């Protein structure tokens, strides 16, 4: 699929490239989203210096990919040296860090160029080597889909092995538009594994490696993927098919909602940092131009006018009404990518047990505000809520303002 999406041009990306570079020079690499925080979190404290160095190195858009790639190569070199010396834990850690950095270096590549494919291969190699040394079972997951396969990684809690028929509860963890499956399970102290919950970190249609593999975003594709993924998970002897939930972050909140609407076997759905505006006008026309360009790549469009028509299909309306399982929505009061009113309207439309939790002053990426520190931590809240659903604990349909 080399060059399959080459030639993406958007008016604002072209006209405002100089502005993006100047904003990055003034504000830094996290101008549009707290990416270095999001990527640092699953790595833990040893990687802090990596991200601090990247923040210093990046002064313009073109610096982003090389900055992450350089750190990835250094970490991969350290991992191989540790492996040769028999230092398994050090090798494990460094392969994980390298995979995260390689994945991050792919983000600016909005086409399946030879460079993007090379970075993707390096990412997979490092994460596969991490999986060999991990402190829990990790295996590559390929879910058959339309003659191809959706890419993921299956994680079992420590102490469990494939085929042991332990009937674990499990979640399908869906990343956001700019997120990737490798960062959805922490190197240590993961919130799901620590609760005895297995995790399928899998990229659905259009997301990261699925886009590389030529599987584009569309509402019908996500509806079909919901059943494909559930069939795969339900067939695993280690997992309890009655206790499989779906959770999505950022644009994964929209995808997760579609999944719950079209596959009733998922027993619960929890979403956070919402992208629930029908048509996605705010994120594509008022936020950083990079969001629109990225999603055009994800959906396989090169013509902006055709993509604008396609965006009209990106809605939960006519789908969310079908959800019958418990639904949690965690949102920021000041979400700049998807105004809170759209999450409010979705919750009013749902015909299932539901709960909305709004964090005061929080922007799209819920957290980094006093309410997220003084109240329940957003990601912890989601994990505890889903765990409670696995064990059938009742809850009152409520709207919390934290």
For the regions a protein language model found, what residue spans apply to each?
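N-terminal cap/lid segment of alpha/beta-hydrolase-fold proteins
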Residues: 66-68, 72-75, 117-166
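Alpha/beta-hydrolase active-site loop
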Residues: 216-238, 258, 378
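Alpha/beta-hydrolase fold nucleophile elbow
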Residues: 237-250
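Hydrolase active-site cap/lid region
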Residues: 258-309, 325
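Short beta-strand/loop motif that positions the catalytic acidic residue
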Residues: 323-324, 329-331, 335
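Short alpha-helix in the alpha/beta-hydrolase fold that links the catalytic acid
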Residues: 325, 339-348
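Catalytic histidine neighborhood in serine/cysteine hydrolases
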Residues: 347-366
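Catalytic active-site module of serine/aspartate enzymes centered on a nucleophile-bearing elbow/loop
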Residues: 371-402
């Amino acid at each position: 699929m080399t060059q399959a999406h080459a030639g993406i041009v958007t008016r604002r990306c072209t006209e405002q490239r100089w502005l993006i570079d100047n904003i990055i020079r003034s504000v830094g690499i996290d101008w549009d989203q707290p990416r270095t925080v999001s990527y640092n979190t699953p790595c833990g404290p040893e990687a802090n210096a990596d991200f601090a160095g990247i923040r210093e190195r990046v002064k313009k858009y073109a610096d982003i990919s090389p900055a992450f790639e350089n750190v990835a190569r250094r970490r991969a070199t350290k991992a191989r040296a540790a492996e040769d010396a028999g230092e398994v834990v050090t090798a494990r850690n460094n392969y994980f860090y390298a995979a995260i950095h390689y994945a991050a270096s792919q983000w600016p590549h909005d086409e399946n160029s030879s460079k993007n494919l090379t970075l993707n291969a390096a990412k997979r190699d490092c994460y596969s080597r991490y999986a060999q040394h991990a402190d829990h079972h990790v295996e590559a997951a390929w879910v058959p889909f339309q003659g191809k396969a959706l890419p993921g990684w299956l994680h079992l809690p420590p102490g469990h092995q494939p085929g042991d028929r332990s009937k674990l509860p499990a979640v399908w963890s869906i990343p956001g538009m700019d997120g990737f499956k490798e960062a959805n399970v922490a190197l240590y102290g993961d919130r799901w594994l620590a609760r005895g919950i297995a995790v399928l970190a899998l990229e659905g249609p259009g997301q990261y490696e699925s886009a590389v593999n030529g599987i584009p975003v569309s509402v019908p594709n996500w509806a079909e993927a919901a059943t494909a993924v559930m069939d795969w998970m339900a067939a695993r002897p280690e997992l309890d098919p009655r206790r499989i939930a779906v959770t999505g972050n950022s644009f994964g909140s929209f995808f997760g909602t579609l999944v719950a609407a079209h596959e009733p076997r998922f027993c619960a759905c929890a979403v956070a940092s919402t992208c629930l505006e029908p048509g996605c006008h705010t994120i594509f026309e008022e936020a950083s131009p990079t969001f629109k360009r990225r999603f055009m790549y994800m959906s396989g469009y090169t013509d902006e006018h055709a993509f604008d028509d396609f965006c009209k299909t990106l809605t939960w309306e006519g789908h969310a009404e079908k959800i019958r399982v418990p639904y949690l929505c965690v949102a920021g009061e000041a979400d700049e990518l998807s105004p809170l009113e759209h999450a409010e309207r979705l919750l009013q439309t749902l015909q299932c047990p539901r709960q909305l939790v709004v964090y005061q002053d929080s922007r799209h990426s819920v957290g980094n505000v006093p309410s997220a520190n003084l109240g329940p931590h957003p990601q912890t809240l989601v994990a505890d809520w889903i765990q409670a659903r696995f064990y059938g604990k009742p809850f009152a349909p409520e709207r919390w303002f934290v």
